[in-house]
Regions:
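Conserved, well-ordered alpha-helix/loop/beta-strand core segments that scaffold catalytic motifs
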Residues: 99, 103-132
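Alpha-amylase-like alpha-glycosidases and glucanotransferases acting on alpha-linked glucans and related
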Residues: 1-107, 132-210
């Protein structure tokens, strides 16, 4: 069968927004608080997930600019100062909170699934790509770690030369890393990325790493 991803995304997004709207209802919040302290769990997740605010603002920005990639946004959000970022967080507060909420739902459900699998003696192998997408929160928040020009466009991109998979080679388009900058930080971004992924899986495979 053929999956119609557009329709699937539209359908699921509608359900997630409905779930968020219901959560904002005071009566529903009271019900959660008395049954399993859902609100406290959510607040703890938000406080302990240092990556969450940047991700939520990035996604809210994507919505605000109608899906445009970050390098085509207004300069105040394309490459914001700390003050400008705070202003956008306030301006898009409702959308930011929505993206925080659905990330919480995902992590909560994934944690339950992983625990169930582990209890049954099943280990989960995660797949972490060695490169990240140009239009991603990783690049938007860490421009100096990637080989970009002053406008945010990649100077060099990932790919492979001709091999037994493709006679003409492949151009993936992912921006390459600026390794000199990673060295200066002690590869902090990499360590954070791997540590985080190891919370989601028991083992990791670095994809396309040879």
């Amino acid at each position: 069968c053929k999956i119609e991803y557009g329709k699937a995304i539209e359908f699921k997004t509608g359900l997630l927004k409905k779930a968020y709207e219901r959560y904002q209802d005071p009566d529903v919040q009271d019900a959660y608080s008395t049954s399993e302290d859902f609100a406290t769990e959510y607040n703890t997740f938000c406080k302990e997930s240092e990556w969450l605010d940047d991700y939520a603002l990035f996604m809210a920005g994507k919505d605000y600019f109608q899906g445009a990639p970050w390098y085509m946004w207004e300069d105040s959000l394309k490459k914001p100062t700390a003050k400008q970022k705070a202003e956008w967080m306030s301006k898009l507060a409702v959308e930011v909170e929505y993206y925080r909420f659905i990330q919480f739902l995902f992590y909560r459900q994934w944690e339950a699934l992983k625990q169930y699998a582990n209890d049954k003696g099943i280990k989960i192998v995660g797949d972490i790509p060695i490169f990240v997408a140009w239009d991603s929160v990783d690049v938007w928040c860490n421009k100096k770690l990637f080989d970009l020009d002053s406008k945010g466009y990649p100077k060099t991109v990932a790919g492979v030369p001709p091999d037994y998979f493709s006679a003409t080679g492949q151009l993936w388009g992912n921006p390459l890393y600026k390794w000199s900058e990673h060295t200066k930080t002690g590869y902090e971004w990499w360590f954070k990325r791997i540590r985080h992924q190891l919370k989601l899986a028991d083992f990791l495979r670095i994809d396309h790493f040879r």
